[in-house]
Amino acid sequence: MNQNSSLSSSGMMGSGGFGFDQFSNNFSIKTKQIESINKMLSLKSESSSSNNNNNNNKAISGWQEVWKVLIFDTHCSNIIAPILTKGALRNQGVTLYLPLHSDRQPIQDVPAIYFVLPTSDNIKRIAEDCKNKLYDNIYLNFASKLSNQLMEELATLTIQSDSVSMISKVYDQFLNFISLENDLFVLNNPRDSYLSFNDTRIKDTQAQENIDMVVDSLFSVLVTLGVVPIIRAPKNSAAEMIALALEKRISTTLQSSGGSNVFSNMNEMGSQLSSFYRPVLILLDRNVDLSVCLHHPWTYQALVHDVLNMSLNQVRIDVTQNGQTSKKSYGLDSSSDSFWSSNTGAAFSSVAGEIKSQINEYYQQMEKLQQITDIKLDDSDDFDNNNKKSNENKTKGLGNLVQEMDEKKRLIDIHTNLATDLTKNIRDRQIDCFFAMEESIITRSLTDKKELHSLITSPIVGETGGRGTLEDKIRLLIIYFLSTKNVPQSEMDQYEDALTKMGADLSTLDFFKKTKAFNESLTAIANVNQSSTQSSNTASGKIGGFMQMMTSVTGYQGVESFTNFFQQGVRALLPKSKDLFVTRIVESIMDLKNTLDADYLYLDPKIQNKSNVPKRTTPFKEAIVFTVGGGNYVEYQNLQDFSKKHNKKIIYGSNELLTSKEFLNQIKNLNKN
């Protein structure tokens, strides 16, 4: 068996002039991962290789048009699902895809591509497949590096069954992460990441495993992007341990024979350019800003995630049509859904107005299409009886228009249903009021404590005068507590008594009380954007007006009923422009403001002499920001707003993207310990 280190992609830069824009356009984690997986599926890497172990002696060139079987484990299924559709797999010649640990029948004369995590259980099952000769031959692709121990185990098992010849090639693909957007990724590891990195009772061996998993996945991200970054991380933190381990792994790889090729995904000139435009990898502990994990969001993507529980770009909601309610699942993909791509970071009130515009545009286009169709049907002169090809082209053109309109209606239906469900939740829970109050607290512009008191102490949803769920109230109280320097004890007692009478579990609040005393970073949260002078009452009033407008909405009745959904000027209902704490840290590091040098490591994996690492003198144009212990869409969107404003490229990643409910549950479990 031959084991190769798979390159993340082939040359991506043209033969013309080179510049930052061309390099920066390739700074897309999703695009790069798709390229790598497509290359794996097409078997293009085999085109110039001979295979000593393949007794079938089949020509590899052109195999991308031949039927192939894709075998994957659950881990790698999660990697593929958000980025490749069934149609995309068919385009690569994959007509059958099956779980590794399932009962599978032999398929003769067909090659099988395995995409799995390197584990002992997977190795044993692969060896069993080889023994049973399920396929013509096998191409093994591991999501992360196959250890020598597992390689030896595979060799031993296949030698014992005389089936070594079944395996054509073995590849380390370095794809052990999940891309959700071009600038967003998460790790493919077990959940409860905040709990894992903050539980003081965890064993040393488990703590090291947690660090190793993050290092392995971040290494995959860097290999896929084809970059060796400068690494920055706060000292005395889990992020520091990950940074040091990652630097060591990169340095060791670069020093090994052929190691530099692992990070090379460009031609010679492109490699020189990527060396000049090196990004910075910023590792941050989740504890640097805890309150952002509890924010009530107001942008579209963040709301869909937090309220509708979107996971891996999939969301499942109740949809009512013709009096019948059923569950529907939607895949939200920015590359194929133009509305989603354009509105993920927009305020929900703006999205609602955009849906109305799309519906109006749809009806206008349908009217025009109907007129064209009527003319074509009525005017026989439009068709040339002597020119069959011309007539076919005209008919095909009409067919394409109809398909385009069907797709447009499908997207309108999806986002109408999502907006309707969000609207119901916003109205019932008064999410707009909680959002406005949190904005005023964080920007230190709170002037109406009566509204704060009402939101926390009023009955819960479902009761007379109800405002929000218990979770909504606890989130608001914690944000107020964390973001306010001195909250009178009598005031806290009043809020806690009210919540306790409603049946609230305040163990999460107890945790934050303990944390606030010694976590210095929380102090900075109270000072976010002190210069903001915009009144919170204005924002609250506008958003409240938005909700009054929506009270007549009772449910989805189809596209037609939605045209009257929004009749008022909702585009003015935008959140205040502000940089969150993580964004300000990123800005400081990227612009070399030197305000964090004493507290943050500066690591360069390319430098052998670690005691004398030269510092960068020009600002960074690209960054990979990774939060250890969980991230969220509020933070992600804030970074993207910053990057667009300052012409930078920022990729955001974390162990997982947490809803506020998930984060609170982890805090609750942590506090039990």
Curated annotation (Swiss-Prot):
Any Pfam family hit: Sec1
Question: What is the first-listed, main subcellular location in coarse terms?
Answer: cytoplasm
Keyword check for Disulfide bond, yes or no: no
Keyword Amino-acid biosynthesis included in the entry's annotation: no
Membrane topology label: Peripheral membrane protein
Q: Where in the cell is it found?
A: Cytoplasm; Endoplasmic reticulum membrane; Golgi apparatus, Golgi stack membrane
Which BP terms does GO give this entry? Answer: endoplasmic reticulum to Golgi vesicle-mediated transport; intracellular protein transport; retrograde vesicle-mediated transport, Golgi to endoplasmic reticulum
| Entry keywords, A to Z | Cytoplasm, Endoplasmic reticulum, ER-Golgi transport, Golgi apparatus, Membrane, Protein transport, Transport
Task: Give an example GO molecular function.
Answer: syntaxin binding
The record's GO CC annotations read: endoplasmic reticulum membrane; Golgi cisterna membrane; Golgi membrane
State the function annotated in the UniProt record.
Involved in vesicular transport between the endoplasmic reticulum and the Golgi.
Family assignment from sequence similarity: Belongs to the STXBP/unc-18/SEC1 family.
Protein name per its UniProtKB record: Sec1 family domain-containing protein 1 homolog
What is the organism of origin for this protein?
Dictyostelium discoideum (Social amoeba)
